[in-house]
Amino acid sequence: MVGEQPFLLGVNYWPRNKAMGWWSDFDAAEVRDEFTLIRSLGMSLVRIFLLWDDWQTSPDSVNRAALDNLGTVLDTSAELGLTLDVTFFTGHMSGPNWAPGWMLLPDEPLPPRVNQLVSGGEVVDCGYRNPYVDPVVLAASELLLKTVVAQYREHPAVGFWNLGNEPDLFAWPPAPAAGRAWVRRMTQVIRELDPIHQVTCGLHVDSLVHDNRLRVSDVFAETDFAAMHGYPMYVPWARDPLDVDFVP
């Protein structure tokens, strides 16, 4: 504890044997085994990701099986003394972007800066709706938040809610004001249901050195605390790919 701020040691989690196939091939025993290992290593926080493609196969519904499986993950975490960072809108993860089929725009090209797009388990080559301003995506996003937060806001394993994993890598807002408005809107939806747990949004170094219209100052003016992902292997000015001084 430094002052009033705890130092938490945690880990991003995907199952070792299936990675982003977790929610579509959920195994409660696997979660228990791996969370037991995480706890044995002295970690207390686990960040999990609600892969959008699995959680919302249509814009007007939330995958009930995934919702129930999240309850299993939370129960297991509580039993083991782990706290969860629950990350919504996981459209970007480990290279590819992952978009539900209803979000695709088949006649549009793949957006700039997107290396690969996966939907329904297949690599696709097309554009998709902008999550910051598209009314269909905004309504679906609010539905996902309301469903998950209402169901689990009182669960003891919930640590905080997270609006995304480096969301600028999935899409840029059309303007900085649109990016801030999106963060404000999503945060308000959560706070109306759950005034207790804090809200953050996982950004990365590119947000510090480039204007991707999802500005750090705007994001953290609307959320409760800053979350920054530092990867020295992605910047030319780090001393080496594992530069220990890159993130103090």
Model-based region annotation:
Residues 1-225, 230, 235-237, 244:
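Active-site mouth of glycoside hydrolases
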